[in-house]
UniProtKB/Swiss-Prot annotation:
BNR repeats lie at residues 55-64, 151-160, 359-368, 423-433, 469-479, 717-727, 814-824, 1099-1109, 1141-1150. The lineage of its organism: Eukaryota, Fungi, Dikarya, Ascomycota, Saccharomycotina. Gene3D superfamilies: 2.120.10.10, 3.30.60.270, YVTN repeat-like/Quinoprotein amine dehydrogenase (2.130.10.10). One of its GO terms (biological process) is protein targeting to vacuole. GO terms for cellular component: cytosol; Golgi apparatus; membrane. Residues 1373-1514 are cytoplasmic. Residues 1480-1491 have a biased composition (Acidic residues). Pfam families: Sortilin-Vps10 (PF15902), Sortilin_C (PF15901). Keywords: Glycoprotein, Golgi apparatus, Membrane, Protein transport, Receptor, Repeat, Signal, Transmembrane, Transmembrane helix, Transport. This is Vacuolar protein sorting/targeting protein 10. Residues 1505-1514 have a biased composition (Polar residues). InterPro entries: Sortilin_C, Sortilin_N, VPS10, VPS10-sortilin, WD40/YVTN_repeat-like_dom_sf. Residues 20-1351 are lumenal.
């Protein structure tokens, strides 16, 4: 029985449909590393690779070689952007080739013959002038040097000429002003170029209106440095640089819509040079800036997504930007526009505050969460609740299109990152479904109706062979096609760039074996996948289409957009090949609120209402001085809605918002008025926080002004613009417990939360990795870091702890070496460990680790030991000390405190972590049993220690000691130096200037010990690292011009005294700044003792402490900015709403009111380098609803006109001068004359450049007494000499022999040692060694080393003696005897011709005789002089004894002085004051009077009574 024919036809069609597959061909002849470039609206493909240029006109089935590569230069290809269907250029073999007919024919472009092209950089095409091309190449000039050259062609690339802009430059970037056919610039061939030099302030912006024949310079504004430009259809955007010395400098944007007039755009936050990734234009002429705010060049999140950590969107005139982030916590986000779907954006919140993905389909006005659904229950990964099923997309910035709302993306559900899948959306990204269970590369065809995907892992389906999957119904169903090769896919593209075609090329690298991990890059696999015969080539009819409305049919910028797309189930080809995706547009009749934006004077609040933008008004000054009415909203540019809404005007109060208005402020300010150098004004930005601000710290980098702030409520905030804007770190997350910064890696910080998590950032808080800490109680102890490995650190936790007071609770040290991914217990009972090997310069191992270990068996005595390891305790540790009190690492030293039997402390020091030496304390320390000491620092080559000599009833003071260079022996610098209960000492080194130290001493120590008085403090200062001390010289007048009232004008009764380190609320608030060289600010008083804080005034010095000025009555807080170019003060401990500031190094002061209401300013902070123009005020206030704190960011950048010019080639015409620290230009400090750099103009700011690097050492000086300090156990006398401490005998140096059994000899100390900082040369030499002495018991070895044996005696003495006797006899025989003998010796005179000279020998002998005669006469005369001096001395002595001494006026000669100096110091060698013995015979030196300091006299080469200056050169 036959089946009906109609049934056979149906069965045939069904079977054909079921068995249909695309035509897949393996292509041959394609280079393994070739680029595949399809022409638009064409079947022609270019393959450009190592072998050359191949062309295929049949979708790659057959290839023809057109150009062969010789391999001399890199190969590149560029398709003509505006004629992509026919024109392309290829750079090959150092030449440029072009085609005008899809690669069928190629021509060589002609260039000037004097240059050899080596690399193509850019080729740019005009959308309107089709025959004009501009190109940039690297070429060799006549000297064979490679440089960048720019060319222009006016004949469609056949020939090029040099683009001569008439400017010298290092590089140049040129573009056509019109970048597309939709450009709003004039439709012509105008060319915009920017020339670049090594200094951005010399860059030029140039415009040509005649195809590059001539250029004119465009003016952006006066004193504006810029380094880049961006083009959109409506705007030319210039990126200007505020600081030309900083690679990560802040930038401003200047915008022009006509390439003539430029206006500065308002930015809501600071931007850096590295922040801007790209600028695109959205509907309504709005610009969108994607930002990558990180020090890393390609920061990625856990999914591999590049982090656009924020976005900025402008209003429709391009001049006012607002943040595009939508997170309630302002978390870091990735924001990506879907460019072929107008108004559609996808946003991913990244990091701790991640809220998943959200989407906007109305140009960013509203946002909604991406919705995932599992229709048909196909996904093996399930969610308990579909509402909690978060879709995480993998690469949201890559969309294959264009399509009519059909999107394909990779991603995963919730946290299942390892289970990547392929997802499909058919409504423009609002709703998503799983397409494939595995990740793959993909492409769309027929405008999204056909989808091709290839698994990234060929074995994802348990089959080692590669395959492709394809869908013919927009991703609803999928079919598999098995391929013949095993390979790793690299890319799949639609050969038709507009997405309309049905042919694809799949490329990859083959795998030799199924288990290969690395593909063979020399064996490329290329497939052609052809879908042109799908559905038998049937074209869709009208019934097969549906309407897809963009934005769900809502109006976007006044219009509705509708796509006509194929139905999902239709069995036909929906589009036409080479026909672009089109949409229908319908103008909206009624305008809606979303068609409007806030007027420039307004900004949307949290409820979406336009309110007055006071920050914008203050920053720009764009309003008159009187109140005005302004519409709060305006229609967005290019909006097409017809019937506008009635917009009400709102009052804008502009009082005090535009202080730069010339009507309000005179151009030359009077005293007390603000300076008006710049075009803007000081800006203040407020932020408030619930609770008290308890932590704040800047990252110590110049990349930006990032900081972390935490409150008493456990909330943490991150700012990258010095507190203008904040990110809430733990929004709706666990409270913050502790914050630690890495002292060695300035971009790293660690945040502990109360749930046992550690959040780590290595990019200044832009991104964080979350680490689960080992199970333990957080004790709030600091982390210990490896100084050379940021991934290695030690964490301390409490084990067996129910609470911190639990008796079973003990500290455990955990170490991680992989950045916290894993932790291991370092050592049982280790309570304090440090990576000393990574910080000690002399250590043999960077991994040397010291640990203080608690002995659990001696809990009552709290015994601690010190152990070391170099293998992280994999082997048995080395016990360094059995008992210690503690240890600390300070610079180049590790100092260990070891307990003695009678509660005294012994300190040991090491510089390499292996050899330890007991510190030798001076004999005159006045401390019977040292019970406490403080290590004060070691930055100048010596260790400073404070040993406590008295501590009772919260009163403490002690001796200040300084070590030699290896930290072992100490001398006492000062007694009774003030200390507090916590061990902090009134000791501070002036930052940036070596050897200047301030300290407070207790002047009534005896009364305090007796209990009869309170502390009386006075401040002393040293300018030579502690050798000489003096009280601070006070100013003559106070800030009111009145004299100070002191009992005496002498310095010992009337000096400046300052409150110091022990009284500070924040120990970071130092007198000085390392960038404001020579400047110090302090609170104190003039008198014979330091008064209470509230009775003091505020003082300033700009010359390192030599002279001071009272700048304010009362106590003020202070901060330095811009290297001292800005000084700001705020009342300390009082409610205030203003600050005082100076821009001329304290000569004049101005007040700035930052608020109407008064607050308590608890601190003023800025970046650690003190180089910024912004300051952060930490404020507090008690209000009705509880305690509230805040910050005020005060920005001075608008106050200055320009950046200071630093030009060493033209120093008389820049903004800097060199100055010296000290009273005299000829003054030497530490053996050299130094000059420092400081700006000389108020109108400019310095920026981030380190001025200290330009410090000039003019020359080294000859050594004087000021270059030496007393040696160990020697004490300085009133006359400046160093004498042995009373009660000691010389020769104690022999003790060194006991410590080193191999030593044979030792040397006695001269009593002096050279200051480590001194670089003096020649002159006085006080630290020379004595003659060697034998070590006890080593006399024999000493004699062998320095003694003379019999044979040596014969050679050294007897042989020369025989020679001398023989020579003497010869001279006597040939000279003296022949000429009459000794009888004529007294008659011989130089120049006489009486001597016998018959030959040359006689002449030589007679010359010797004449020299001997002359020498004898000099010796005889010298004997007479000595006899007269002896007689005169006897007479003077007897005259004094008899009371008949009279003034004597003698002409003291150089030699006479030396002789008398020897007499003066004779017999005092043990007191180390024999200065004459240390002087080089041929050295010149000056001896002059010096000012006597209080208690400590400067050294005098003359007696104190004389005032004469004796110069050895006279």
């Amino acid at each position: 029985m036959r089946l009906p024919s109609i049934f056979l036809v149906f069965f045939y069609l069904f079977a054909r449909t079921l068995c249909w597959s695309p035509e897949v061909s393996l292509l041959h002849g394609v280079d393994s590393l070739a680029s595949i470039i399809p022409f638009d609206d064409s079947s022609t493909i270019l393959s450009v690779g190592r072998k050359g240029v191949n062309v295929s006109h049949d979708y790659g089935r057959t290839w023809e070689t057109k150009l062969r590569n010789k391999g001399e230069y890199p190969v590149s290809v560029t398709l003509n952007t505006f004629r992509p269907n026919s024109r392309a250029f290829v750079f090959l073999n150092g030449k440029l080739y072009g085609t005008h007919n899809e690669g069928s024919d190629w021509f060589e472009s002609k260039f000037p013959s004097d240059r050899q092209l080596t690399k193509a950089l850019t080729i740019d095409f005009s959308p309107f002038a089709k025959d004009v091309i501009i190109a940039s190449f690297v070429a060799k000039d006549n000297q064979n040097d490679e440089k960048e050259f720019n060319y222009v062609s006016t004949d469609d690339g056949k020939s090029f000429r040099v683009l001569d802009v008439g400017q010298e430059y290092e590089s140049m970037r040129c573009r056509f002003l019109s970048i597309s056919h939709e450009s709003n610039f004039p439709h012509n061939d105008n060319i915009i170029c920017m020339t670049k030099t090594s200094s951005p302030d010399q860059n030029k912006l140039l415009l040509s209106e005649n195809r590059g024949k001539s250029f004119k310079e465009l003016s952006i504004g006066e004193d504006i440095a810029f380094d880049n430009f961006y083009l959109t259809n409506s705007y030319l955007v210039i990126r200007s640089i505020r600081d030309i010395h900083n690679k990560a400098a802040e930038v401003d944007l200047y915008v022009s819509s006509d390439a003539k007039d430029f206006k500065k755009a308002y930015l809501p936050t600071t931007l850096r040079r590295s922040d801007i990734r790209r600028i695109i234009e959205l509907l309504g002429r709005k610009m969108f800036i994607t930002l990558t705010r990180s020090s890393e060049s390609n920061v990625q999140d856990d999914n591999g997504n590049t982090l656009f950590t924020d976005g900025l969107v402008s209003n429709s005139d391009g001049l006012k930007f607002t943040s595009f982030s939508t997170s309630a916590s302002k978390s870091r986000t990735t924001i990506t526009p879907v460019e072929f779907l107008n108004g559609t954006f996808i946003q991913k919140q990244v990091g701790r505050n991640s809220g998943g993905y959200s989407i906007s389909i109305d140009n960013g006005n509203t946002w909604r969460k991406l919705k995932y659904s599992d229709k048909g229950n196909k996904n093996p990964i399930k969610c308990q609740d579909e509402n909690d099923c978060n879709l995480e997309l993998l690469i949201p910035q890559i969309f294959h299109g264009p399509t009519a709302g059909i999107l394909v993306m990779l991603g995963h559900i919730n946290d299942n990152f390892s289970d990547q899948q392929t997802f499909i959306s058919r409504d423009g990204g609002l709703n998503w479904e799983m397409g494939l269970e595995f990740p793959g590369i993909y492409a769309t065809g027929d405008l999204g109706n056909v989808i091709v995907a290839c698994p990234v892992d060929p074995s994802s389906d348990n089959d080692p062979q590669s395959e492709i999957y394809y869908s013919l119904d927009q991703g609803m169903t999928w079919s598999e096609y098995q391929l013949d090769e095993m390979f790793i896919p690299i890319d799949v593209i639609n050969i038709t760039p507009d997405g309309s075609g049905l042919s694809f090329i799949l490329t990859g690298f083959s795998l030799d074996k199924p288990d290969d991990q690395r593909p063979n890059i020399d064996n490329r696999v290329t497939y052609l996948i052809d879908f042109n015969n799908v559905h038998d080539g049937k074209k869709c009819k009208a019934k097969d289409y549906e309407k897809f409305e963009l934005a769900e049919g809502s109006c976007i910028n006044g219009a509705k957009y509708t796509f006509n797309r194929r139905k999902q189930s239709a069995k036909c080809i929906g589009g036409e090949v080479f026909k672009d995706l089109l949409f229908d547009m319908e103008v909206c009749t009624e305008c809606q609120e979303q068609d409007y934006e806030c007027s420039s004077e307004f900004i949307k609040d949290s409820k979406g209402v336009c309110v007055v933008d006071e920050k914008w008004l203050s920053a720009t000054g764009n309003c008159p001085s009187t109140d005005i009415k302004k519409p709060a909203m305006r229609l967005i540019a290019d909006n097409m809605c017809k019937k506008e809404l009635p917009i009400q005007s709102k009052s804008v109060s502009c009082k005090n918002k535009n202080p730069s208005d010339p009507k309000d402020i005179p151009k030359k300010p009077k005293e007390g008025d603000r300076p008006t150098f710049g075009t803007g004004d000081i800006q203040a930005t407020f932020n408030t926080f619930k609770g008290k601000v308890r932590f704040y710290q800047y990252f110590d980098t110049d990349e930006d002004e990032s900081l972390i702030l935490a409150t008493s409520e456990g909330e943490a905030y991150i700012s990258h613009d010095s507190g203008q804007t904040y990110t809430h770190f733990n929004y709706n997350k666990p409270k913050v417990h502790e914050i630690v910064f890495n002292e060695y890696f300035n971009s790293s910080a660690y945040i502990f939360d109360i749930d046992g998590n550690l959040h780590v950032t290595h990019d200044r808080g832009y991104t964080f990795d979350t680490i689960r800490l080992p199970a333990s109680l957080q004790l709030g102890l600091p982390l210990n870091f490896h100084s050379k490995d940021p991934n290695t650190f030690i964490y301390y936790g409490g084990k067996n702890c129910k609470s911190i007071f639990d008796t079973n609770c003990h500290i455990v040290a955990f170490i991680t070496r992989d950045g916290g991914k894993s932790f291991s217990e370092l050592l049982p009972n280790a309570i304090h460990c440090e990576f000393v090997g990574s910080s000690l310069k002399l250590s043999d191992s960077d991994d040397l680790l010291f640990c203080q270990v608690k002995d659990e068996t001696s809990s009552k005595t709290r015994q601690r030991s010190l152990v070391s390891t170099t293998d992280y305790f994999e082997t048995e540790p080395k016990v360094v000390f059995q008992k210690i009190l503690g240890y600390m690492t300070n610079g180049e030293y590790v100092i260990i405190a070891v307990p003695g039997e009678n509660h005294e402390i012994t300190a040991y020091v090491t510089m390499d972590g292996d050899e330890f030496a007991e510190t030798l304390l001076p004999y005159d320390l006045d401390i019977e049993q040292p019970e406490a000491f403080t290590v004060l620092g070691s930055s100048t080559g010596s260790v400073f220690l404070h040993f406590t000599s008295f501590q009772e009833n919260s009163v403490a003071f002690g001796s200040l000691l300084k070590s030699n260079t290896n930290g072992t022996s100490y001398v006492k610098l000062q007694s009774n130096v003030n200390r507090n209960e916590a061990g902090y000492v009134d000791f501070e080194k002036v930052q940036g200037l070596d050897g200047i130290i301030l300290t407070n001493v207790v002047t009534n120590a005896d009364e305090i010990k007796d209990g009869s008085s309170q502390k009386h403090l006075r401040t002393k200062i040293t300018f030579n690292d502690g050798v000489d001390w003096e009280y601070i010289k006070p100013p003559k007048k106070d800030s009111s011009g009145d004299s100070y009232h002191c009992k005496s004008n002498k310095l010992e009764h009337c000096s400046l005294n300052l409150h110091s380190y022990t009284e500070r609320k924040d120990f970071r608030d130092t007198f000085s700044s390392g960038s404001a060289l020579g400047m110090m600010i302090g609170v104190g008083n003039v008198g014979d003792k330091l008064l209470p804080f509230e009775e003091c005034s505020t003082f300033l010095t700009i010359d390192g402490g030599k002279s001071w000025t009272e700048i304010k009555k009362g106590a003020y807080q202070w901060e330095f900015g811009d290297h001292g170019g800005i000084l700001i003060l705020s009342r300390d401990g009082e409610m205030t709403n203003s600050i005082s500031y100076s821009t001329d190094f304290g000569k004049s002061w101005y007040d700035y009111q930052f608020s109407d209401e008064k607050v308590l300013v608890s601190d003023i902070v800025t970046v650690p380098q003190d180089s910024a123009l912004r300051f952060l005020l930490i404020t507090a206030d008690r209000i009705g609803r509880g305690f509230e704190s805040g910050t005020v960011t005060v920005d001075f950048s608008g106050l200055f006109k320009r950046q200071c010019v630093l030009d060493f080639n033209n120093e008389n015409h820049d903004d800097f001068d060199y100055f010296s620290i000290g009273n005299s230009e000829n003054e030497c400090i530490f053996g050299h004359k130094v000059k420092y750099l400081r700006k000389n103009s108020e109108e400019c700011y310095v920026g981030a450049v380190s001025l200290s690097q330009f410090t000039r050492v003019m020359k080294n000086c000859t050594c004087t007494r000021a270059d030496f300090e007393c040696d160990y156990n020697f004490v300085r006398q009133y006359d400046g000499t160093c004498k042995l401490v009373d009660g000691l005998q010389p020769g104690n140096e022999a003790a060194i022999c006991k410590k080193d059994p191999d030593l044979v000899e030792y040397f006695q100390s001269t009593g002096y040692r050279k200051i480590p900082l001194s670089t003096c040369q020649g002159g006085l030499k006080l630290d020379g060694r004595t003659e060697p002495l034998p070590c006890p018991g080593k006399e024999k070895e000493f004699k062998q080393k320095y003694g003379i044996s019999g044979s040596s005696f014969f050679l050294l003495f007897f042989v020369p003696f025989l020679f001398f006797v023989s020579a003497g006899w010869f001279v006597y025989d040939r000279g003296i005897r022949r000429n009459g003998g000794f009888a004529r010796f007294g008659e011989i005179r130089l120049g006489d011709d009486q001597l016998i000279e018959e030959n040359t020998t006689d002449k030589v002998v007679n010359t010797i005789i004449r020299f001997g005669v002359a020498s004898f006469e000099v010796m005889a005369g010298g004997f007479g002089i000595i006899r007269r001096i002896a007689n005169n001395s006897f007479n003077r002595i007897t005259g004094r004894m008899n009371g008949r001494y009279r003034p004597s006026y003698s002409n003291l000669m150089h030699d006479d002085f030396l002789d008398e100096a020897d007499d003066l110091l004779a017999g005092h060698d043990d007191d180390a004051n024999d200065l004459a013995s240390f002087m080089d015979d041929d050295s010149n030196f000056d001896i002059e009077d010096e000012t006597t300091s209080v208690n400590d006299s400067g050294y005098r080469d003359q007696s104190p009574e004389t005032e004469n200056v004796v110069d050895s050169n006279n």
